[in-house]
């Protein structure tokens, strides 16, 4: 997945969201490429990893002191994610006529994953997180 860089006027929330999204992509790529957990490395696996990291960042943002600011940051993060989905699917060769259908299906998958993600923020040896990972496999 490749981050789109926007050339429009950016506000504080957009700047924070862009920096966080860059971190999400960097950590996701590092996790995907530095581990041998995955038999195959394709777009689906990349989507799942980015989704998990994005959900964790959204959760962390909700714990921050300035909740009003970080709610807007989360909105910007989701906008960046959807734009990135669109761009990366186009790069895969999906045409303009069907791109909306694919983006919509991936966004639905992401929101489903949010609803099933464990409530506990400590994911180490967390049984519900292990069940979540089995669910998305």
Predicted regions and their residues:
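Surface/interface-facing alpha-helical segments and adjacent flexible terminal/loop regions used
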Residues: 1-49, 59-137
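Generic transmembrane alpha-helix motif of multi-pass integral membrane proteins
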Residues: 54-56
């Amino acid at each position: 997945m490749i981050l789109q860089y926007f050339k429009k006027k950016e506000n504080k929330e957009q700047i924070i969201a862009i920096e966080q999204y860059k971190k999400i992509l960097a950590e996701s790529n590092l996790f995907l490429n530095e581990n041998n957990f995955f038999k195959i490395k394709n777009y689906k696996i990349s989507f799942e990893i980015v989704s998990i990291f994005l959900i964790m960042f959204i959760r962390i943002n909700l714990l921050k002191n300035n909740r009003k600011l970080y709610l807007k940051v989360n909105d910007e993060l989701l906008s960046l994610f959807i734009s990135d989905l669109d761009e990366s699917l186009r790069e895969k060769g999906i045409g303009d006529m069907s791109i909306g259908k694919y983006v919509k299906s991936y966004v639905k998958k992401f929101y489903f994953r949010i609803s099933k993600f464990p409530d506990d923020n400590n994911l180490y040896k967390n049984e519900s997180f292990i069940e979540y990972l089995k669910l998305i496999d």
